[in-house]
Amino acid sequence: MRQKLSFQTLQKKDDMKKILFGLTAALLTSAAAANTLIPDVSPASSGQHVVINITQQRLFLYDNGKLSKIYPVAVGKAMTQTNLGEHKIGAKAYNPVWHIPKSIQKERNDGVKSVPAGPNNPLGPVFVRLGDPKLSLGIHGTNAPASVPGVRSHGCVRMKSPDALEFAKTIATGSPASVIYQMASLNEDANQNLWLAAYRDPYDKKNLDTAALKKSIAAWAKAHGKTIPA
């Protein structure tokens, strides 16, 4: 769903909910909009930096401060949320054995404690450690590609297996990885039109700051000599 936005629209909670579930809406409508809007982050100016926005179900890879790749991902469910915050990319394991965590063993209740490498392994062809090993988090492939993107993992960040292999070969161990929760993005396109994307709230944080959005939009409009409908 796309529609022209106004400050009045941003003030109405019911209207904002419609926008959230519409996923993408346009401000100062143009025929050309970016397919994926970029979150409001300050990536590392040198080296690589991974940014995962839970609400977008997207992984953004930056090289020397510039966006180089966007991948769709599946993230943790509301009951098994992916840990927000600052992490580091850790060790990589190709053709990993899945040693099933006890919590998942209990959930499965089939007596299986591990799954060998192969087409039936939920980790896919590669597992990249995300953060402290004590968190048991990783960025990995999958044997269920239709589940990506989505909000359905036990906390790990799931990628389609070809993407996971590409990512693993590209990313350097020790690179910073930021897991964020931004419910809206504002980006300017090549035609100097401003686009707003608003996302679902899978962890029910209710932290969409419409006042900050209004302030940012007003500042942009003033800088570009444009008028926002009241």
Regions found by a protein language model. Give the residues of each.
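Short, Lys/Arg-enriched N-terminal segments with co-localized hydrophobic residues
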Residues: 1-15
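Sec-dependent N-terminal signal peptides
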Residues: 19-28
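N-terminal signal peptide c-region/cleavage motif recognized by signal peptidases
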Residues: 29-33
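Gly/Pro-biased beta-strand-loop elements
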Residues: 35-147, 166-170, 194-230
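Short, charged beta-turn/beta-strand-edge "cap" motif at the junction between a beta-strand
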Residues: 80, 182-186
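Short, basic/aromatic beta-hairpin or loop at an interaction surface
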Residues: 145-155
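Short beta-strand-centered segments at strand-helix junctions
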Residues: 153-170
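Loop/turn positions that initiate beta-strands
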Residues: 174-177
